[in-house]
């Protein structure tokens, strides 16, 4: 009887063990099926969400002058969805005031992109993938929070226009930007630059430069290397003097230097016949110089131009030369009188 009891007990234990294992297996299979179902539902939901987002983005696409443009303004898009890659034929992004915080790394998929305009957002970083956009002609990132420009931007060989105004902490550019052989328009105003970066001086096609409202203390001595520059905006800086070589900028026709700390105007600038407009307003110039009265019939705008334009500059240089000569003569006379009295 004892042997039979033991045998029955063993069978019951084995049976219970198998029942437990079978139940666990069934539970595991059930959980796995539930997980698969959830993933399938998630994928289906994600697919539908992508379709909805894609449909919404397609509504923002317009065609102007044969160019495909994605235009979004005053909506909330802190990030751009990966589904956007399906619209890689877009040639221009115009995304303004949408709260965008970053440029997606999949930007490199948009090989047809000609204009990337993300002005007035909250972008903090330019991804290195930007360098793969070899057809890009315009990059507009003014009024953002960019503090660093990647060297890869120098690979955008067709870039003609770059705007980085009002990015708060931006104070330097990578030397590789001098590789932008076609760049003609550059706006770096309202930042933290203390001088014009070397890479900017070395841009061979640069025609228009705005570095107003920075903290420029000096201008580079080789500024004349910007041979094609015709417009230079430098108002609201900390400039105390101008290098003589500025007079060698033969293409320069507009020069704005208002609200700096200039004490003098280089005499050599008198020979800059190419200058059409120059502004020295609100500088603590050494000599108080006023142009002779103009005819009463001259309009106020013309008077304003005359007073603070090229005519003022030339008149100031002439007066400074005259007064400097008079001062030298006075000093010389005093010295001669002293020598005479001693004798």
Curated annotation (Swiss-Prot):
Signal peptide: none
Pfam families: LRR_8
Keyword Cytoplasm: yes
Record localization: Cytoplasm, Myofibril, Sarcomere, M line
LRR repeat feature ranges: 64-87, 88-110, 111-133, 134-156, 158-180, 181-203, 204-226, 228-249, 250-274, 275-295
Classification via PROSITE patterns: LRR (PS51450)
Domain of life where this protein originates: Eukaryota
InterPro entries with a match to the protein in the record: Leu-rich_rpt (IPR001611), Leu-rich_rpt_typical-subtyp (IPR003591), LRR_dom_sf (IPR032675), LRR_domain-containing (IPR050216)
Bilayer-crossing regions: none
Predominant location: cytoplasm
Function field: Component of the sarcomeric M-band which plays a role in myocyte response to biomechanical stress. May regulate expression of other M-band proteins via an SRF-dependent pathway. Important for normal contractile function in heart.
UniProt name for this protein: Leucine-rich repeat-containing protein 39
């Amino acid at each position: 009887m004892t042997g039979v009891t033991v045998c029955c007990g063993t069978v019951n234990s084995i049976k219970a063990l198998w029942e437990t294992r079978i139940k666990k297996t069934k539970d595991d299979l059930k959980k796995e099926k539930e997980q698969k179902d959830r993933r399938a539902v998630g994928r289906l939901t994600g697919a539908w969400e992508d379709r909805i987002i894609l449909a919404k983005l397609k509504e923002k696409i317009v065609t102007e002058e044969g160019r495909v443009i994605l235009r979004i303004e005053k909506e909330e898009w802190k990030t751009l969805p990966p589904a956007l890659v399906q619209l890689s034929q877009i040639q221009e992004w115009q995304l303004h005031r949408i709260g965008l915080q970053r440029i997606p790394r999949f930007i490199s998929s948009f090989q047809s992109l000609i204009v990337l305009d993300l002005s007035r957002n909250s972008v903090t970083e330019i991804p290195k993938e930007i360098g793969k956009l070899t057809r890009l002609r315009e990059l507009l990132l003014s009024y953002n929070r960019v503090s660093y420009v990647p060297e890869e931007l120098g690979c955008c060989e067709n870039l003609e226009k770059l705007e980085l105004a009002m990015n708060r902490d931006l104070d330097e550019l990578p030397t590789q930007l001098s590789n932008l052989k076609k760049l003609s328009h550059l706006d770096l105003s309202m930042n933290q630059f203390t001088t014009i970066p070397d890479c900017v001086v070395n841009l061979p096609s640069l025609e228009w430069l705005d570095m107003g409202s920075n903290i420029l203390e000096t201008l580079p001595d080789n500024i004349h290397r910007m041979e094609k520059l015709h417009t230079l905006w430098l108002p609201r800086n900390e400039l105390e003097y101008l290098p003589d070589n500025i007079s060698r900028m033969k293409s320069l026709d507009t020069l704005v230097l208002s609200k700096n700390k200039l004490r003098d105007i280089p005499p050599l600038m008198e020979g800059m016949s190419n200058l059409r407009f120059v502004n020295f307003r609100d500088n603590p110039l050494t000599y108080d110089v006023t142009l002779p009265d103009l005819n009463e019939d001259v309009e106020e705008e013309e008077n304003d131009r005359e007073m603070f334009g090229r005519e003022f500059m030339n008149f100031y240089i002439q007066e400074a030369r005259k007064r400097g000569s008079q001062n030298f003569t006075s000093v010389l006379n005093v010295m001669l009188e002293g020598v005479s009295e001693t004798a």
